[in-house]
C-alpha cells in the first residue's frame, strides 16, 4: 500500500494542559470536525471518545494518552491526548518524547496553572514547538489578555496572540484573525453557522495594535522581515505566516489562539493553526542514536528510504488483542508480519499485526511509514523507551528518563484466589507504567506498590479490581525518604575472618563526601601501586552500592554521595571479591559517626485556589503542615496560595481542604525536590523505623 499522506502533510501533535482546562473536550471536537466521530461525547456526561478507560469516564480526567489519527485539509494529524493530572506526568513525558509539536490548552479564567508549568517544562526539555489554545472563553471570568499575561509571567515564554476574541463569557461570539486581518462570527453554539467577515469597527483599533505587536515580535526573529519592517514596507499575509511558522518550529515563539471547545468555537481555526504553524517530521532535527557495541553516534532522517527505526513509547493491555505496543516511526518502513530487532534489549521481535488507533476502536494496516504513530501486536520483550530497528542496521535511540516513585503503600490480596491473580496484574501494570513499581519487602513479606502520588496508586488499585478482578486491601501510604551525607570523611573498613581452612580478608580506606543534588552515587578508584588489586575494585563499588540501598540512619536509600577508594591492603590467599564487598559496607557503616548523615524528604509544590474569606484558615493550615508559603495572588474572585509542603504532611489534604472551605477550594500538588527534614522530625522517623 502506497503512502497516503506525504511527510510534509503529516503532523504528530500532543494536547497538553492542566486538569480541567478542557483538553479532552478540545480533542473530541477535533475528532468530530475531522470526521472521525459522528456524535460528540461530553466529558461531564462521562462519554468522551478519548477517555476510554472506565476510571477516566467516572473521574472525568484523562489517564492514558490514547493515540488517534485524524485528517484535515489533506493532512494527517496524529493526536496524543495527554493526562493533565500531576500524578500522570510520566504519560506526558512519554508522549512528548515522540511528538513533533503540541497544543497547550489553558483555561481562560485561570491562565497558566501549576500542572501547565510542569508540562511546559517537560516540553521545553524535549524541544517541542507549541501553540497555546486559550479555551473556555465562554466561562464566567474568562479573560484572554490576562491568560496571555500569565504565559509571560509564569512561563517566561515569548508568546503572542495571533487572534483576539470578540466578547467573552456568554457574549463570546467571534474571533479576530490578526494574521489574515478578518473575523469569524458564530451564529450558534454548534459550530455550524460560521461567517468570515471584516473586523467589526469597534474592534479595529485593538486589532491593529496587536497585529503591529505580532509583526514586531516575529520580525525580531527573522532578519529579512526585520529589514522590510524597518523600511516601512508592507509585510504580506504569506510572509507573516512563513515567519510565524519558522519561529514556532524553532521553539523561539509561541502563537496564542482562543476559543471554546465546548461551544464549538475556534476548533476549526485551531486545526488550521496546527497545519500552518506546527512542524511536520521533516521540520524537526533528525533523531540521533548510537550504534550498539561501538557507541558511535548516528542520525536517522525522516525518510522512507532510511533503515527502519522506531521508539516504543507506551505499552497497553487490550482485552481483545493482548499486549499493544505504541510506537513512533522515525525512519524507514515496517510491514506487518516482519521481524525487527529490539536493540535496547538485544532481542529479535516479530511484528504480528499493525493497528492504527482511534481512541478505542482500531483499524488494521499492513504498512507504516516514517513519521507515523501506530500500535503493534505480538511484541514479547519490548517495554516503554525501547528502540525497534532494522536487523541489518542497528541503532539505539535515546531512551526516556523516568522519575523515581515518591509514595508507596502495602497491598494484600483479600483471598487465596486473588493472590495468584495479583502477581499477574502487578507485573502487567508495571510493564505499562515505568513510574509504577511493585516489590516484596524482604523483612515483612508484604507486597509494596509505589508510584507518583495518591491518585496514581488509587487508580492502579482500581484497575486491578476492574481489569484483573483482583480484590485487595491497601495499607496507609508511606513516604519515600532518602538519606545523604553532609560532611566528608576518610573511613576504614576491615573484614578479617579466620576459621579453619581458607580465611577471608578485605581491607579498604574510603573517602566519602557529599555530591551535588540529583547526581546520585559516584564511585572513583584512586588506588596507586596496586595496594588493592584491580580485580577487587569493582567488588568495592558493588559492595557500597548494595549497602547504600539500606541507609545508616533509618534504613532508607542513601543518595548523592561520592566515594573514592584511596587505600587498603589484601592477602594473597584469603582475599576475595566477597571479602572486599563486606569491607566496603563496613566502611559505609563507620561513616555514620563522621559524615553527618541526614534524612531527606520529598517536597511537593502545592497550589491552593480558594475564595478570599478562607485565606487565613488555609495559610494557617499550610504552616501547620510544615509548609512554606512562596507566593499569593488574586485570580478572578479567588485567591491562589503557592507553597512548598512536605509530602508526608499532604496525606488526606483533599478532605481537610474540603471541610475548611465548604467544598469550594481546589488544590494540586506536584513533586518538586528532596529537602533535609528538621531534626525533631528526623528523630521521629528514626525511632519509628527502629520500632521504638
Swiss-Prot record:
Gene Ontology cellular component annotations, sorted alphabetically: cytoplasm
Q: Record-annotated residues binding GTP? A: 17-24, 81-85, 135-138
UniProt main location, coarse = cytoplasm
Q: Which InterPro entries match?
A: EFG_II, EFG_III, EFG_III/V, EFG_IV, EFG_V, EFG_V-like, EFTu-like_2, G_TR_CS
Please state the gene responsible for encoding this protein.
fusA
Q: What does this protein do?
A: Catalyzes the GTP-dependent ribosomal translocation step during translation elongation. During this step, the ribosome changes from the pre-translocational (PRE) to the post-translocational (POST) state as the newly formed A-site-bound peptidyl-tRNA and P-site-bound deacylated tRNA move to the P and E sites, respectively. Catalyzes the coordinated movement of the two tRNA molecules, the mRNA and conformational changes in the ribosome.
Q: Which SUPFAM superfamilies match?
A: EF-G C-terminal domain-like, P-loop containing nucleoside triphosphate hydrolases, Ribosomal protein S5 domain 2-like, Translation proteins
Q: Which UniProt keywords apply?
A: Cytoplasm, Elongation factor, GTP-binding, Nucleotide-binding, Protein biosynthesis
Please list the GO terms describing molecular function.
GTP binding; GTPase activity; translation elongation factor activity
- Quick check: keyword GTP-binding in the entry? yes
Name it. Elongation factor G
Read off the Gene3D superfamilies from this record: 3.30.230.10, 3.30.70.240, Elongation Factor G (Translational Gtpase), domain 3, P-loop containing nucleotide triphosphate hydrolases, Translation factors
Any single GO BP term? ribosome disassembly
User: Which branch of life, at top level?
Assistant: Bacteria
The record's section on CDD domains has: EF-G, EFG_III, EFG_mtEFG1_IV, EFG_mtEFG_C, EFG_mtEFG_II
The cellular location(s) given in this protein's UniProt record come to:
Cytoplasm
Give the protein family.
Belongs to the TRAFAC class translation factor GTPase superfamily. Classic translation factor GTPase family. EF-G/EF-2 subfamily.
Q: Where is the tr-type G domain?
A: 8-282
Amino acid at each position: 500500500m502506497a503512502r497516503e499522506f506525504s511527510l510534509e502533510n503529516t503532523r504528530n501533535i500532543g494536547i497538553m494542559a492542566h486538569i480541567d482546562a478542557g483538553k479532552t473536550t478540545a480533542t473530541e471536537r477535533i475528532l468530530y470536525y475531522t470526521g472521525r466521530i459522528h456524535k460528540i461525547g461530553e466529558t461531564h456526561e462521562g462519554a468522551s471518545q478519548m477517555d476510554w478507560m472506565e476510571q477516566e469516564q467516572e473521574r472525568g480526567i484523562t489517564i492514558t494518552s490514547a493515540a488517534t489519527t485524524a485528517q484535515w485539509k489533506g493532512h494527517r494529524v496524529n493526536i496524543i491526548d495527554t493526562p493533565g493530572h500531576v500524578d500522570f506526568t510520566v504519560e506526558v513525558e512519554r508522549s512528548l518524547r515522540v511528538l513533533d509539536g503540541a497544543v497547550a490548552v489553558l483555561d481562560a479564567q485561570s491562565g497558566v496553572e501549576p500542572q501547565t508549568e510542569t508540562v511546559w517544562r517537560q516540553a521545553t526539555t524535549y524541544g517541542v514547538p507549541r501553540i497555546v489554545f486559550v479555551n473556555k472563553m465562554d466561562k464566567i471570568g474568562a479573560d484572554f489578555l490576562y491568560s496571555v499575561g500569565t504565559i509571560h509571567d509564569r512561563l517566561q515564554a515569548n508568546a503572542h496572540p495571533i487572534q483576539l476574541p470578540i466578547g467573552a463569557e456568554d457574549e463570546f461570539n467571534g474571533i479576530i484573525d490578526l494574521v489574515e486581518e478578518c473575523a469569524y462570527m458564530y451564529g450558534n453554539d454548534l459550530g455550524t453557522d460560521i461567517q468570515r467577515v471584516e473586523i467589526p469597527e469597534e474592534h479595529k483599533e485593538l486589532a491593529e495594535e496587536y497585529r503591529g505587536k505580532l509583526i514586531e515580535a516575529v520580525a525580531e526573529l527573522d532578519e529579512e522581515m526585520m529589514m522590510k519592517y524597518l523600511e516601512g514596507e508592507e509585510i504580506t499575509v504569506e510572509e507573516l505566516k512563513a515567519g510565524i511558522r519558522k519561529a514556532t518550529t524553532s521553539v523561539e515563539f509561541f502563537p496564542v489562539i482562543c476559543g471554546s471547545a465546548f461551544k464549538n468555537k475556534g476548533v476549526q481555526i485551531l486545526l488550521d493553526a496546527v497545519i500552518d504553524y506546527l512542524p511536520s517530521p521533516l521540520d524537526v532535527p533528525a533523531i540521533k542514536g548510537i550504534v550498539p557495541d561501538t557507541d558511535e553516534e548516528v542520525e536517522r532522517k525522516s525518510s522512507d528510504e532510511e533503515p527502519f527505526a522506531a521508539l516504543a513509547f507506551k505499552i497497553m493491555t487490550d482485552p481483545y488483542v493482548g499486549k499493544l505496543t505504541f510506537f513512533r516511526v522515525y525512519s524507514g518502513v515496517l510491514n506487518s508480519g516482519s521481524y525487527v530487532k529490539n536493540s535496547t534489549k538485544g532481542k529479535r521481535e516479530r511484528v504480528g499485526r499493525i493497528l492504527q488507533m482511534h481512541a478505542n476502536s482500531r483499524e488494521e494496516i499492513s504498512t507504516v511509514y516514517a513519521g507515523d504513530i501506530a500500535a503493534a501486536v505480538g511484541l514479547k520483550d519490548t517495554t516503554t523507551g525501547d528502540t525497534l530497528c532494522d536487523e541489518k542496521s542497528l541503532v539505539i535511540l535515546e531512551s526516556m528518563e523516568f522519575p523515581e516513585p515518591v509514595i508507596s503503600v502495602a497491598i494484600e490480596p483479600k483471598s487465596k484466589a486473588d493472590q495468584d491473580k495479583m502477581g499477574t496484574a502487578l507485573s502487567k501494570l508495571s510493564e505499562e507504567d515505568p513510574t509504577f513499581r511493585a516489590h516484596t519487602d524482604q523483612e515483612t513479606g508484604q507486597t509494596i506498590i509505589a508510584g507518583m502520588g495518591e491518585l496514581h496508586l488509587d487508580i492502579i488499585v482500581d484497575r486491578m479490581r476492574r481489569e484483573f478482578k483482583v480484590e485487595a486491601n491497601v495499607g496507609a501510604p508511606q513516604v519515600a525518604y532518602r538519606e545523604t551525607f553532609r560532611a566528608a570523611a576518610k573511613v576504614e573498613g576491615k573484614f578479617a575472618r579466620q576459621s579453619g581452612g581458607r580465611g577471608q580478608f578485605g581491607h579498604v580506606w574510603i573517602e566519602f563526601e557529599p555530591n551535588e543534588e540529583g547526581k546520585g552515587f559516584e564511585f572513583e578508584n584512586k588506588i596507586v601501586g596496586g595496594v588493592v588489586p584491580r580485580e577487587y575494585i569493582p567488588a568495592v563499588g558493588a559492595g557500597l552500592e548494595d549497602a547504600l540501598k539500606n541507609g545508616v540512619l533509618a534504613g532508607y536509600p542513601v543518595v548523592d554521595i561520592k566515594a573514592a577508594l584511596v587505600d587498603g591492603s589484601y592477602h594473597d590467599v584469603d582475599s576475595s571479591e566477597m571479602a572486599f564487598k563486606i569491607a566496603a559496607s563496613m566502611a559505609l557503616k563507620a561513616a555514620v559517626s563522621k559524615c553527618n548523615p541526614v534524612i531527606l524528604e520529598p517536597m511537593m509544590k502545592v497550589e491552593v485556589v480558594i475564595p478570599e474569606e478562607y485565606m487565613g484558615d488555609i495559610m494557617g493550615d499550610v504552616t501547620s503542615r510544615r509548609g512554606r508559603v512562596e507566593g499569593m495572588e488574586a485570580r478572578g474572585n479567588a485567591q491562589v496560595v503557592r507553597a512548598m509542603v512536605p509530602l508526608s504532611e499532604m496525606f488526606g489534604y483533599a478532605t481537610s481542604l474540603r471541610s475548611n472551605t465548604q467544598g469550594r477550594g481546589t488544590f494540586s500538588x506536584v513533586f518538586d525536590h528532596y529537602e533535609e527534614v528538621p531534626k525533631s522530625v528526623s528523630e521521629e522517623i528514626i525511632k519509628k523505623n527502629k520500632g521504638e
